[in-house]
Amino acid sequence: MGSMDQSIAVKSPLTYAEALANTIMNTYTVEELPPANRWHYHQGVFLCGVLRLWEATGEKRYFEYAKAYADLLIDDNGNLLFRRDELDAIQAGLILFPLYEQTKDERYVKAAKRLRSLYGTLNRTSEGGFWHKDGYPYQMWLDGLYMGGPFALKYANLKQETELFDQVVLQESLMRKHTKDAKTGLFYHAWDEAKKMPWANEETGCSPEFWARSIGWYVMSLADMIEELPKKHPNRHVWKNTLQDMIKSICRYQDKETGLWYQIVDKGDRSDNWLESSGSCLYMYAIAKGINKGYLDRAYETTLLKAYQGLIQHKTETSEDGAFLVKDICVGTSAGFYDYYVSRERSTNDLHGAGAFILAMTELEPLFRSAGK
């Protein structure tokens, strides 16, 4: 089992995932999950993690918590209120697929259909790339691949809407075309086709920095989306290669001391840069899933083990009242310059990072178990 066989002074990854999920579920009712009473990707990412926990443990309370959130916002006819001008609104729809599979309640399919309709009305670049939001015209962000990609593929498989496969392939190819940096192999956070944003490079339109979480959303998307394509689809091979190349590039910038990654990935030598938890978790998820699915070489277990140990040692703690805490999670962030990113607020148990942490731990668990720990 490679490097995961090494003796590690931490518990099972699933133990930590449950500790964090239980802490947040004990802190917030589904009505209170921030931003309260909204169909939003913050809750969506966290609840995707909670549903993975349900699948891993069989504990029904995890399923019921996610279901209660959906039932709070979806009425008897499958109606729900969501922002109709942004990709972010779609991501929480990922929870609808396991809810429907388990309950066969058609409300969840109707709600998914409403979210799916958004693809037909979103504004696009000249090449057909979705604007991230109407508030950010002509811009594609790496985040958008996760916000809209996995849902589209799952919906395509549920309803046999094969055109959605081509849609996601196009979106990913455009992001890669416009944001990949040939020198580092990393992807810039955003691209402005109009080149009007203050941060936009006057030649390429790219934002100037490699933001950890945005790259994390991207590699997690790839790791999840490969298996959603038809088995003989040519882009399975393309996405595997892209994932392999991105992980290879990301791992060059892993902090040697902690095993984690910096808020601005390639500038760990700057004193005001800092090790960020959510991006580190998303990289761990993508690496673990890549190993589990055979997309990545098992040699990456060394990288994974170092990150796992560093995350638990440096970014988690248990409070006096028994709450499990994950620290140094960057709050919601737009595209910008270096100073903007490194000055962003650092949160504890923010749902971005909580969801990423739980997803990473559940994906790590099979490797941990196979090592006999």
Swiss-Prot record:
SUPFAM superfamilies with a match to the protein in the record: Six-hairpin glycosidases
UniProt subcellular location: Cytoplasm
Molecular function in Gene Ontology: unsaturated rhamnogalacturonyl hydrolase activity
Transmembrane segments: none
Temperature dependence: Optimum temperature is 50 degrees Celsius. It is stable below 50 degrees Celsius.
Swiss-Prot/TrEMBL GO biological process terms: carbohydrate metabolic process
Keywords for this protein: Cytoplasm, Glycosidase, Hydrolase
GO cellular component, one term: cytoplasm
pH curve summary: Optimum pH is 4.0.
Enzyme Commission number(s) from the entry: 3.2.1.172
Catalytic activity line of the entry: 2-O-(4-deoxy-beta-L-threo-hex-4-enopyranuronosyl)-alpha-L-rhamnose + H2O = 5-dehydro-4-deoxy-D-glucuronate + L-rhamnopyranose
Broad class of where this protein is predominantly found: cytoplasm
Consequence of changing D143N: Loss of hydrolase activity
Active site (UniProt): D143
InterPro entries hit by this protein: 6-hairpin_glycosidase_sf, 6hp_glycosidase-like_sf, Glyco_hydro_88, PolySaccharide_Degr_Enz
List of residues binding substrate: 40-41, 88, 132-136, 213-217, 333-334
PANTHER family per UniProt: UNSATURATED RHAMNOGALACTURONAN HYDROLASE (EUROFUNG) (PTHR33886:SF8)
Described purpose of this protein according to its UniProt entry: Catalyzes the hydrolysis of unsaturated rhamnogalacturonan disaccharide to yield unsaturated D-galacturonic acid and L-rhamnose. It cannot act on unsaturated glucuronyl hydrolase (UGL) substrates containing unsaturated D-glucuronic acid at the non-reducing terminus, although the active pockets of YesR and UGL are very similar.
Family: Belongs to the glycosyl hydrolase 105 family.
Complex formation: Monomer.
Protein name: Unsaturated rhamnogalacturonyl hydrolase YteR
Species annotation: Bacillus subtilis (strain 168)
